[in-house]
Swiss-Prot record:
It is found in: Membrane. It is a single-pass membrane protein. Signal peptide: none annotated. One of its GO terms (cellular component) is nuclear pore. The chain crosses the membrane at residues 976-996. This is Uncharacterized protein DDB_G0293534. Residues 45-128, 873-887 have a biased composition (Low complexity). One of its GO terms (molecular function) is sphingomyelin phosphodiesterase D activity. It comes from Dictyostelium discoideum.
Length: 999
């Protein structure tokens, strides 16, 4: 017999806390410390697992009337007979889809022997629990009381509801506690409730391995890479999901408390998307649910239309259009002023100034609220990472201390689980093309969608990568292939902000290092982050839509360059997370302003300015980002480049391919900076050396294939012995010849090196008067010493990233890469005009310098295009070649537009930045034909054939479409000139008439 659903007051229902084997309640924990043997303490809590009764309603599927009596199986519904075997536990409250049902339930704890294994109960994450849960609070202090009641009741079924109040569910709403911080006290109180020292966090840590309470997580929110790794690759370490069951009838994702919280936390940027407009709280309190959903959708569409205000001085249509306001009020049943102000008002249309002020206040309020929420979230992310990935700083100046031998006082499994969940939540939303090719039709329909990265996700990823680079810096960027060998150069001391070495830090030289548990944890953590980042970059460049006009390529490249250039620890690590900086900010500004400043410092690009418009004073490619051979060049940077070689080569190849079909003006400046970094002599020579090792791996791979092919032939066709002996002799002779050739080449290379050294010595002897400079190691691009260590690292990366079949794509200096670069140069030469001439020439020169091929001659082409542009009236009289060039130049000079010929936001920004010209006569976009469409003609950009002052002044005075159209037609230069001529003729006629009549 199943227990029926009931009407339950979740806030008032108190459930006995779950006790551990020692009889101590988890809710009465006053102190908490993390040790390496924390697993033993946590596992003791799960010895007695209670069993509960309930009926759950899952949003993704229906599990009704299922009675599973297996010990190791999780079931959403349990029979009443199974509750008789529970020990000191009560049945958790299962939130139903309808909390207003008039049924009853009872909870009766029964005591039996604890030796009988029981089955935990799954609590469904139903949307009805989130929108109809009686948990209500108006500020952070009321939320503190609600949270305390939930903690005292050992969560039970309130866990889903309380997480929804903290981190939201699916749709954005104003009811989460992070959006209720109004002042500094609220921010401090909320951080104290959620940070690692809070009771909530300690309770989550205590229940890391406790599976007595499990929950259904929404399937649509789980990253696709997680589902792919568990179901297709069968990867179960670290365990981030307890159970997954996907078929045509149901989609179940079962997690425990720890997994549920950090999945919800890692996916919280979905709620932080600044482009999504949030509704006022009044719309969420509508009694009619069906009408409420329709009104919300219509209001969102209307608000998005009202936000398309004039951009960069080019008129589109007003924010308080009467048509939009009428459509808004008619579709939703609310007045526009009521929506934006949050109070009821009459349906009469107010003045335009009042409506504009209300709209501006609404936009400003929503933007500031989103910024507050984002700042608090990024602060919590940094504190959680500091808890699970700790590193040391000096007590005096706050610089990072390099100490790979330190012992990490954190549970290793817990740290890996946290890092895997956060990495997949931020980076694992899109699959690679090679992963999609192995899916069947059902899995392809589930996992093939592409999620475009939002600005909030990108800023969160930047914060995540910045912290992990600091963490890796303290381990000296060690490699598992070289930990038993001493470093080739002494480890550097921390560097202060003035550029001088710090003498207060205790960082010393790391002698031959043995594998320790902390190093093993670091290597596993680095694998998790590097694999997630590699798949993130590759999947984005593989599957981006080239027709999308709002691609965040500049921000993606910003993160990529920050990952590729970890040097210069002064500016990119120690200063950013220094305690002194926090103290100075606390003294100079308020706590809330300090929170904003701290978040901006965390999210600031690592020596990179990712402005889509292109900040010409970008720091990318400066001296701090270039790898140089001086006293600051250490073996760890060479080690880092070798360990991440395919981040440089494979993704750069995708960038070259995608740039051929995209407009690079949106990421032109960061693209130039990337080429400057790659063209630095030290990094270029190092990349060439590694690429030659990659070609050696390809040769070995081909030889292995040939050897296997010969063995297969010998197996199928038995050859005579004398033939086999002759073959062996021939192969031995070939091997001897190859060895002799290699020895000769090595001798020649050594002779060349000796000659170069002699020449350098002679030059030094000839110039004795010059001051002696510190000798730096020389890297010769001609001499390549085959290193087994490099070969092992490249082999590991090829297998780890699964790019063995991409032979030409993964080599930075392969023939395919050179051809892609030359093709991009040819395309850029055709797109050169007066506006982008300087920038495009820099890109072309950098590509030609990096791949060592001649620069194309493009001066004549520039002159031809400029002559044609200066004489538009002679197009019909030109020959066919001139016509083709003219049409091509017109397309390049014209800004980005919509299908109807109107400018979009990207086109307006191009005009504002002065990158393109808005021509009045364009054969591709005949503006004269657009007059038949009033709304389109009203949003038409101002051309040189119109008087802009009259149009702007008329648009400011009125919002009437007919009046605006009349002003737009009247403001034409030809029409005004003809009217002036007519008036002048009439005046001249009357003057002559009065002159003769007076006589």
């Amino acid at each position: 017999m199943y227990i029926q659903q009931s009407q339950i007051d979740v806030n008032s229902t108190m459930i006995k806390p779950l006790k551990n084997s020692n009889g101590i309640s988890n809710s009465n924990i006053n102190s908490f410390s993390i040790k390496n043997d924390i697993d033993s303490n946590i596992n003791s809590n799960s010895n007695n697992i209670g069993n509960g009764n309930g009926n759950g309603n899952n949003s993704c599927n229906d599990h009704k009337n299922n009675n599973n009596n297996n010990n190791n199986r999780i079931s959403p519904t349990l029979s009443s007979s199974s509750s008789s075997s529970s020990s000191h536990t009560t049945s958790p409250i299962i939130p139903s889809s309808k909390l207003n049902s008039n049924t009853t339930t009872s909870t009766t704890p029964t005591s039996t022997t604890s030796s009988t294994p029981t089955t935990p109960t799954i609590t469904p994450s139903s949307p009805s629990v989130l929108y109809k849960n009686p948990m209500e609070f108006d500020n952070v202090f009321q939320f503190k009381e609600v949270l305390q009641r939930v903690l005292d009741s050992q969560f039970q079924s309130d866990w889903v509801a309380i997480i929804a109040k903290i981190l939201g569910y699916i749709l954005p709403n104003n009811d989460i506690v992070l959006r209720k911080c109004q002042n500094d006290e609220d921010v401090k109180e909320l951080l104290s409730l959620l940070r690692p020292s809070s009771q909530l966090f300690r309770m989550i840590i205590e229940n890391f391995t406790n599976d007595s309470f499990q929950f259904y997580f929404p399937f649509d929110r789980i990253p696709k890479c997680v589902i792919f790794d568990i179901t297709i690759k069968n990867q179960s370490t670290p365990k981030i999901i307890n159970q997954i069951n996907i078929n045509q009838y149901k989609k179940d994702i079962v997690v425990n408390m720890f997994q549920y919280f950090f999945f919800a936390f890692g996916l919280f940027p979905d709620h932080l998307n600044l482009e999504m407009q949030l509704l006022p709280a009044n719309l969420n309190n509508n009694n009619n649910n069906n009408n409420n959903n329709n009104s919300i959708n219509n209001t969102l569409n209307s608000i998005e239309n009202k936000f398309t205000r004039t951009i960069h001085g080019i008129p589109t249509f007003s924010a308080n259009r009467q048509n939009s306001g009428n459509r808004l009020s008619s579709s939703t049943g609310f007045n526009s002023q009521r929506i934006f102000s949050g109070s009821s008002s009459s349906s009469s249309s107010g003045s335009s100034q009042t409506d504009n002020s209300l709209l501006f206040n609404y936009q400003q309020q929503q933007y500031m609220m989103s910024q507050k929420t984002k700042s608090i979230y990024l602060r919590l992310l940094s504190e959680y990472m500091d808890f699970f990935l700790p590193f040391q700083r000096s007590l005096i100046d706050g610089n990072l201390i390099i100490d790979p031998n330190r012992k990490l006082m954190v549970n290793h499994d817990m740290s890996l689980t946290f890092l895997k969940i956060i990495t997949e939540s931020l980076l694992g939303h899109n699959l690679l093309n090679q992963s999609l090719n192995i899916l069947n039709q059902f899995n392809y329909s589930l996992l093939s969608s592409f999620k475009k990265p939002t600005p909030v996700y990108l800023s969160t990823i930047q914060t995540f990568i910045t912290y992990f680079q600091c963490y890796s810096y303290t381990f000296n960027y060690l490699s598992p292939f070289s930990i038993n060998s001493p470093p080739s150069s002494p480890s550097p001391s921390p560097i202060t902000s003035n550029g001088n070495k710090s003498t207060t830090a205790t960082a010393t030289i790391i002698q031959p290092i043995l594998m320790t548990p902390s190093l093993g944890l670091f290597f596993k953590q680095r694998e998790i982050v590097s694999s997630g980042l590699f798949e993130y970059f590759v999947s984005y460049f593989e599957r981006l839509d080239p027709n999308d006009q709002y691609l965040p390529i500049d921000k993606i490249l910003n993160i990529w360059v920050g990952w590729l250039t970890p040097w210069d620890p002064n500016t990119r690590t120690s200063r950013r997370i220094s305690p002194n900086v926090l103290q100075k900010n606390n003294k100079s500004t308020s706590s809330f302003q300090n929170l904003l400043n701290l978040t901006s410092s965390f999210t600031h690009s690592i020596g990179v300015v990712g402005n889509s418009g292109g900040n010409k004073n970008s720091n990318i490619g400066s001296a701090s980002n270039l790898l140089v051979l001086n006293q600051e060049y250490y073996s760890k940077w060479e080690n880092y480049v070798i360990e991440h070689y395919y981040f440089y080569s494979f993704i750069f190849n995708l960038l070259l391919i995608r740039s051929q079909s995209l407009d690079i003006t949106s990421y032109l400046y960061i693209f130039k900076s990337i080429l400057n970094i790659f063209n630095s002599p030290v990094l270029k020579s190092l990349l060439k050396r590694i690429s030659k090792h990659d070609s050696i791996i390809v040769q070995q791979q081909e030889q292995q294939y040939q050897y296997q092919y010969q063995q297969q032939q010998q197996y199928h066709y038995q050859q005579p012995q004398f033939y086999q002996q002759s073959q062996q002799q021939q192969s031995q002779q070939q091997q001897q010849q190859q060895q002799q050739q290699q020895q000769q080449q090595q001798q020649q290379q050594q002779q060349q090196q000796q000659q170069q050294q002699q020449q350098q010595q002679q030059q030094q002897q000839q110039q004795p008067q010059q001051p002696s400079q510190q000798q730096t190691p020389s890297v010769s691009s001609n001499y390549i010493d085959v290193s087994k260590d490099i070969l092992l690292r490249l082999e590991y990366q090829i297998g780890f990233y699964q790019i063995r079949e991409f032979i030409n794509e993964r080599n930075l200096f392969s023939e395919l890469m050179v051809s892609n670069a030359s093709r991009l140069v040819d395309i850029l030469t055709l797109k050169i005009n007066q506006q982008n001439q300087k920038d495009y020439l820099e890109v072309i020169k950098s590509l030609c310098t990096f791949y060592d091929f001649e620069e194309p001659i493009i001066k004549e082409k520039i002159n031809n295009t400029t002559i044609i542009n200066n004489n538009p009236n002679d197009i019909n009289n030109a020959n066919n070649s001139n016509n083709n060039n003219n049409n091509q130049s017109q397309v390049l000079l014209s800004p980005n537009r919509n299908k109807d010929g109107t400018l979009n936001d990207m086109g307006r920004k191009q005009i504002y930045d002065g990158k393109v010209i808005c021509k009045p006569f364009d054969s591709n976009y005949p503006y004269e034909k657009l007059i038949s469409q009033p709304l389109v003609f009203e949003k038409q950009p101002i051309t040189s054939e119109e008087i802009g002052i009259i149009i702007k002044f008329g648009y400011m005075l009125t919002d009437n479409s007919q009046t605006r159209l009349f002003i737009r037609k009247l403001a034409r230069k030809k029409l005004l000139f003809s009217l002036v001529l007519i008036l002048a003729f009439i005046w001249f006629f009357f003057e002559i008439y009065f002159f003769f009549t007076r006589k």
